[in-house]
């Protein structure tokens, strides 16, 4: 969901926490969401329509957002005296992998017969969240 005002407050220091990302409830839900987002993107391209964009700011502060196939992409800039003082990006991968919350939700309640099955389930969950960077899985037996 586009919410540039909430991000502006966070980056200006008037909010303690960034907005909470929407996390899928299951691996299947994550894939369904990605399919819907791909359909929206394809329809926009076919119609020659712009992709949704939102912005907020003032007094040298600005936040811009757009929807991507993997979620909301946010860019923020602070300009003072004609110079960029701060520039930040919050990508969908940041939102889903900044902590273990999304993966924990996708894997909650699962039990696996073997380390190989656990690795397969974890890999499916990571792929459902669609990171934009390469990743390596490391399992530690507890």
Regions found by a protein language model. Give the residues of each.
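Metal/cofactor-centered catalytic core regions of large enzymes
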Residues: 1-142
């Amino acid at each position: 969901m586009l919410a540039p005002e909430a991000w502006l407050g966070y980056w200006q220091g008037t909010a303690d926490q960034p907005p909470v990302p929407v996390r899928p409830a299951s691996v299947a839900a994550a894939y369904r969401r990605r399919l819907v987002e791909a359909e929206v993107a394809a329809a926009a391209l076919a119609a020659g329509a712009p992709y949704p964009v939102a912005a907020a700011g003032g007094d040298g502060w600005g936040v811009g957002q757009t929807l991507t196939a993997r979620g909301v992409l946010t860019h923020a800039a602070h300009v003072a005296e004609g110079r960029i003082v701060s520039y930040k990006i919050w990508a969908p991968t940041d939102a889903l992998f900044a902590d273990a919350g999304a993966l924990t939700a996708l894997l909650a309640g699962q039990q696996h017969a073997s380390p190989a099955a656990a690795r397969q389930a974890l890999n499916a969950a990571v792929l459902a969240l669609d990171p934009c960077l390469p990743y390596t899985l490391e399992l530690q037996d507890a």
